[in-house]
Amino acid sequence: MTLFHFGNCFALAYFPYFITYKCSGLSEYNAFWKCVQAGVTYLFVQLCKMLFLATFFPTWEGGIYDFIGEFMKASVDVADLIGLNLVMSRNAGKGEYKIMVAALGWATAELIMSRCIPLWVGARGIEFDWKYIQMSIDSNISLVHYIVASAQVWMITRYDLYHTYRPAVLLLMFLSVYKAFVMETFVHLCSLGSWTALLARALVTGLLALSTLALYVAVVNVHS
């Protein structure tokens, strides 16, 4: 039962990444090592973020929820956008190729670093626990989030982006950066359960994805 549970969690977490890699056409461009380079950039950015947070923001321990402090901590996630832009700027090719390489490499590195060990240790335990299923589903939400963020960074860095689209792209980028902070605050204030919080995050990410897709299509069509 424990091995079967681990297999289910592993498949739910990792197979969507493999399917995305195969179906997006990246395998035809031999982009595997480009994705690995994106993953290495992710590790460097996360190290810088950890050092910055540990230096300037003390850990919140109980008591009143520190909204200002948590907001400032969430602002550090801007570094992810800078890292994604760095990855895309080092890759030549079409926009969708750059977006998928950066997003898939970034999300895969996060998956390996933050969820691989918990799944291996926890999902193989004696007792069944839904939190590992939730963790696997959350990894798929993260993949969508990074694809959305990469598309937003690609659009905002276009030198020929129409000025009428720039405010909309900046707004979506702001929402992407502070989405985790807003969701965490909402869950804290409303005392939501784990499944409800996961559903809320999926809905918010889906809305951002649809909005970004509509804007991306508009930008591409204008410049085609």
Curated annotation (Swiss-Prot):
Which GO biological process entries does UniProt record here? multi-pass transmembrane protein insertion into ER membrane; protein localization to nuclear inner membrane; regulation of apoptotic process; regulation of cytokine production; regulation of mononuclear cell proliferation; regulation of nitric oxide biosynthetic process; regulation of phagocytosis
The organs and tissues expressing this protein are described as: Expressed in T-cells, B-cells and monocytes.
Stretch forming the signal peptide: none
Q: How does it sit in the membrane?
A: Multi-pass membrane protein
Pfam families cross-referenced by the UniProt entry: DUF2053
Q: Which residues lie on this side of the membrane: Lumenal?
A: 59-66, 125-129, 188-194
Question: Which Gene Ontology cellular-component terms appear in the entry?
Answer: endoplasmic reticulum membrane; multi-pass translocon complex; nuclear membrane; plasma membrane
**A single Gene Ontology molecular function, please?**
ribosome binding
**Key word Repressor present:** no
Where found in the cell? Endoplasmic reticulum membrane; Nucleus membrane; Cell membrane
Q: Which terms are listed as keywords in the entry?
A: Cell membrane, Endoplasmic reticulum, Membrane, Nucleus, Transmembrane, Transmembrane helix
Q: Which residues lie on this side of the membrane: Cytoplasmic?
A: 22-34, 89-98, 156-164, 217-224
Q: How does it assemble?
A: Component of the back of Sec61 (BOS) complex, composed of NCLN/Nicalin, NOMO (NOMO1, NOMO2 or NOMO3) and TMEM147. The BOS complex is part of the multi-pass translocon (MPT) complex, composed of three subcomplexes, the GEL complex (composed of RAB5IF/OPTI and TMCO1), the BOS complex (composed of NCLN/Nicalin, NOMO and TMEM147) and the PAT complex (composed of WDR83OS/Asterix and CCDC47). The MPT complex associates with the SEC61 complex. Interacts with CHRM3, CHRM1 and AVPR2. Interacts with LBR; promoting LBR localization to the nucleus inner membrane. Interacts with DHCR7. (Microbial infection) Interacts with H.contortus GAL-1 (via domain galectin 2).
Give the function comment from the record.
Answer: Component of the multi-pass translocon (MPT) complex that mediates insertion of multi-pass membrane proteins into the lipid bilayer of membranes. The MPT complex takes over after the SEC61 complex: following membrane insertion of the first few transmembrane segments of proteins by the SEC61 complex, the MPT complex occludes the lateral gate of the SEC61 complex to promote insertion of subsequent transmembrane regions. Also acts as a negative regulator of CHRM3 function, most likely by interfering with its trafficking to the cell membrane.
Q: Which family does it belong to?
A: Belongs to the TMEM147 family.
UniProt-recorded name of the protein: BOS complex subunit TMEM147
